[in-house]
Structures are given as C-alpha cells and as structure tokens.
C-alpha cells in the first residue's frame, strides 16, 4: 500500500443516487490512499455531495459552506470540494460565493476526482461540470465492503440500473443535473 494521502469526510445530502455516488467517491479515494474521517474537523479533504431536489437545497449548501469557513481558518490546508446536483447547476458560482471552496465537480465528473485533486495542488480552483459526451453507460460499481472506505452498512448497497431522465417535467431538475437517461445495457 502507498503512502496515506489523508482523511476524507463526505457529507451527503438528498437521494439514494447521492448515497450511491458517495460510496463511489469513498471507494475511488480509497484507491488514492485516503481513509475515512469521522468528522470534518479531522479531515484533510471534505466533500459535500449535494442534492438540488430536496427543499431549499442550495440554501443548505451555502449555509454549510458558511459554517465551514471556520474549518478552513483553523486548517488552511484542508481541501473543500462541492459535488453533486447543486454543483452541476451552480458551477463556478459556488467558487464566487464561497472562497473557502477549492473545487467543484458535477454528477458526471466524480470519477475525475483524482485529477481534480492534482489540479488543486497546483493552486488552481477547478470547476468540472462537463457532461460526458457521448453519454456513457452507467459504470459498474460494486462497493467493496471489505475496505473501511465503504460508508454503507454491510447489509445495504445501491445498484444503479439507470441514471438521468428523459422527461423534462416543469417541476423537476433531474434531467438538468443528472442528464438524459442512460442505462447499464
């Protein structure tokens, strides 16, 4: 095993798809030698995996980022990233409103986390909210429950069959944040 990069804390908001994405992030960051932190205060990397469907989602994210100013003040080396649906919608606006945020990544970009983190080491504040074109099939991801990177209880797992939606209902942001529907086959 390589050197330990540090500890990661992920705060997840919203739906089961976000829980699934969070588990993918833990697994992916585990391959980069990050271990889970039990709180933001002990983390070297803090990620907010956001939801824009639930009530007042954007306000919750910006409120949490405001509270996290203290964290950045206490530990200027902590990296703070915002991902998920609010990140997909807001993009660079997050960096403008919250100077303590180091990077933003969208729903299709979580597999790019290692590269995004390398960019932050160069002193940049990357925003990666690009839709992957052409839309890729849902990547297989089966959590490895033998590692401490998994944050789900041993008797619970998520399996994505589809991602996104083709119905642009007037009240729903899913097609805008998760993209058009793609499936495993």
Task: Describe these PLM feature segments.
Residues 1-185:
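Proteins enriched for Cys/Gly/acidic motifs involved in redox and nucleic-acid/cofactor modification
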